[in-house]
Amino acid sequence: MNLLIDNWIPVRPRNGGKVQIINLQSLYCSRDQWRLSLPRDDMELAALALLVCIGQIIAPAKDDVEFRHRIMNPLTEDEFQQLIAPWIDMFYLNHAEHPFMQTKGVKANDVTPMEKLLAGVSGATNCAFVNQPGQGEALCGGCTAIALFNQANQAPGFGGGFKSGLRGGTPVTTFVRGIDLRSTVLLNVLTLPRLQKQFPNESHTENQPTWIKPIKSNESIPASSIGFVRGLFWQPAHIELCDPIGIGKCSCCGQESNLRYTGFLKEKFTFTVNGLWPHPHSPCLVTVKKGEVEEKFLAFTTSAPSWTQISRVVVDKIIQNENGNRVAAVVNQFRNIAPQSPLELIMGGYRNNQASILERRHDVLMFNQGWQQYGNVINEIVTVGLGYKTALRKALYTFAEGFKNKDFKGAGVSVHETAERHFYRQSELLIPDVLANVNFSQADEVIADLRDKLHQLCEMLFNQSVAPYAHHPKLISTLVLARATLYKHLRELKPQGGSSNG
C-alpha cells in the first residue's frame, strides 16, 4: 500500500453520510467536502497530522497568493501527479527494503499485538477510556500507517528504554480548522518562505526519513542537523510489521480491507538528540534558568481544561520574568495570511504518567475576529478564569487543612480538589463561549460579566463543598475563616478594588 496513491483515508461527507475510504488524489483534486471518520478522536488527529505532514513535503505553496488559491481551488490531476512523483517510493507501507515508518530486520522474541500501537487501548489505564472490544485486533493498511505515525510523533514511547518523538512523549498539537478536510490540511501547510524561515539551515541537514537512512545506534544528533522531512516523519523506535492476514473488516475503522495487520516486532534502540527541533505544529515554552535559555514543547500535564492554555497556543510572549512562549508556526501563518478572520483551533494530545496514557485530549476552540490583534484581551480572560479558580481553591484548602498555628481544626477532606474539578467543568461552558463571541475591541463589559459569573460560581461551589460539614461544632470557626479567605481573594480580583458581595 502506498499512501500517495492508494485508498487509505477514512472519511464521510461533511454533512453526513456513509464512511468511505479515499486516496490522496481524491482529497486534493475534488470539491467534495469530507471530514475524517474514525472511532477515536486521537486517531482522527493523528490522521490529520499525517495528511498535513505529507502535504508539507509534496505541496507547499510558493507564496501567499498560491496558498489562498489552493485553499479555494482543488488541484488538477496532472498537477497532483507532478507533485507526488518525486516522493512515491518513500510512502510504501510494505516496501521490500524501506517500508514506511519501519526498520527492516528487527529482532524480537515475541510478536507485539497491534493494540500496543493504539495509545490507551491496552495497559493498566485503559479503563480510563471507552474503547470498542478488539479495536486493535487487525488493522487495515491506512489505520496501521496512522497508528505508526501517531506512536512515533504524538504519543509516549513504549517505555522501558524506548524513545519518544522529537517533541517529547505527549506534545500538544495545534491545527487551524477549515470548512472541510481538504482546506484544513492545506491551511496547515507552511508556505515555502515560512518553511525556509522555520528551517534556515535546510541545505546542511540530513533530510531523508529514518526508514531510508536509519538513525545509528548510540548516535548523538544535533537537532539542527535534522531536516524538515526527516523531522516531520521521525521514527524513534525500531518497529517492523509482521506479514498481514487476508481480507476482512478492519477492527479500527470498520471498513473491509484486502490486507490487515495483526502484530509487529519491536526492539530497544538508543540514541540522543541534542537541542529542540522546531516542530511547526506545537507551541513552545521558553524559560531562562541561571542565564541559560531552555525550550520545551507544551504538554498536557494536568487535567485542567484546554482554555487554561489558550494564551500559550495563540499569543506569542517575549521572555518576561524568565518565562515566554512561541505559538505553533501553522497558527502564526494563519494570523498573518488571514488577519481579519476568526479562528477555529484544533488542540489535542495526551496526558500521561511515563508510558501510561491517563487521558486523551481533543478540543476545538473558537476565537472571534480580532484575536490576532488582541492577545492582551485573551491573556486577561485566561488570567481572570485562573484567578477565580485559585481563590476558590485557597479558601477550601484553608477549610480542609485548618490553621495549625491558631489551633483551628480542618475538615481533613480534600474538598478543594473536588471543587477545582467542578470549577473547571463549569468554566468550560463560560470561557470558550466568551472567546468565541467577544468583540475584542470592546471587551471590558464582557470581561466584567465573566467576573460576575465566576464570582457566583465560586460562591456556589464553596457553599456546596462545605455544606456537609457546616454544623460540625469543631469546624464552625474554621468555616468562618475559610469563608473570609474566599471573600478576601474575591475582593482582590475585582478591578480597582471594586466591592464584593462578601
Residues covered by each model-derived region:
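Short Cys/His-rich metal-coordination motifs, predominantly Zn2+-binding knuckles/fingers
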Residues: 140-143, 253
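Beta-strand elements of modular eukaryotic interaction domains
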Residues: 128-130
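Acidic (Asp/Glu-rich), glycine- and aromatic
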Residues: 140, 149-150
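Flanking scaffold residues of small Cys/His-coordinated metal-binding clusters
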Residues: 132-135, 244-245
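Extended alpha-helical scaffolding segments
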Residues: 1-123, 150-502
